[in-house]
Amino acid sequence: MFDENSNAAGTTPVASSLAATPNANLMSQVFNVKDSRWLQVEVCREFLRGQCARSDQECKFAHPPPNVDVQQGRVTACYDSIKGRCTRENPKCKYLHPPQHIKDQLLINGRNHLALKNLLSAQINQGGNQMINPMLALQQQAAAVNLLPNTQMYPQYYNGMMYQQVLPDPYAAAAQQLQTAALLGNVGGLLSAQSAAAALVANSSTQPPTPSPLLRLQRKRALEEDTSNGNDRTAAAHTQLLSLAAGAVPVKRPALDKNGAMLFSPAAPQTPQFNPYLLQTLQGYVPTVSCEYMQPPPF
């Protein structure tokens, strides 16, 4: 059975052990101050008017005697009367001696009040410990994190739910490797083309500057001289030099977006521009038109 005095005695050591905490004053107020709100009972309004036809054993509201103080339509029950030990007769007790059905309801209210008080004290005690030992809480949290395994944890699979991809995509990895290899190959080809062009330029600089046979052939008119007997070997060398010089594009850093992907891949096939000097089959051929006046054939 509920006993307020026994509850106060049982919580005295707890309050004394928490005296060193910053919330000791609040704890003492919670445990030592007696709250009598759970002992209050509503008075029957019809009884106050003198119109209630029920007796005090049948009415669910209180029928207080004249010696009991009524405040705002409510009276306070005698705790000693609930425990069966009230001996006040002269003068009579100023608190209500409730009947049995009201006494049972007051005992239920007392148990609920005690549970609420214990819950409040536990929350205050927990909050005080967190304020006193913040470093201890951080150490405990770090220890709990270290206890976690370093391996990858796979969540439980449920049907009908969409999950984010955890394992890497093999197709994406293969495409990235191919793109990297193509980029490295393109850079190597550009470097080799630049070195070959530099070597040819160095060899040509040692010889005296002479006009190119291909340029001389282009300046001459097609009707005056036949270009089929030209120096094919010299024209082929000159054409190779021009192709190497045209292919030597300076290496630039690839442009990247925010995600790290390349905006323009150097390995992508590029459409070469048309250059009539790079034609191997038609060396030195430039179409010309005669400007001389030609007489019409006689009829």
Curated annotation (Swiss-Prot):
Molecular function (GO) terms for this protein are:
RNA binding; zinc ion binding
What the entry lists under InterPro entries is as follows: Znf-CCCH_Muscleblind-like, Znf_CCCH
Main localization of the protein described in the UniProt heading: nucleus
**Record field: transmembrane:** none
- Protein name, entry field: Muscleblind-like protein
Zinc finger regions, C3H1-type: 38-66, 72-100
Source organism of this protein record: Caenorhabditis briggsae
GO cellular component assignments? cytoplasm; nucleoplasm
Functionally, this protein is described as follows: Binds to RNA with repeat sequences CUG and CCUG.
Q: Which Pfam families match?
A: zf-CCCH_10
Question: Which family does the record assign?
Answer: Belongs to the muscleblind family.
Localization (cell): Nucleus
User: Which biological processes are named by the entry's GO terms?
Assistant: regulation of RNA splicing
UniProt entry keywords in alphabetical sequence: Metal-binding, Nucleus, Repeat, RNA-binding, Zinc, Zinc-finger
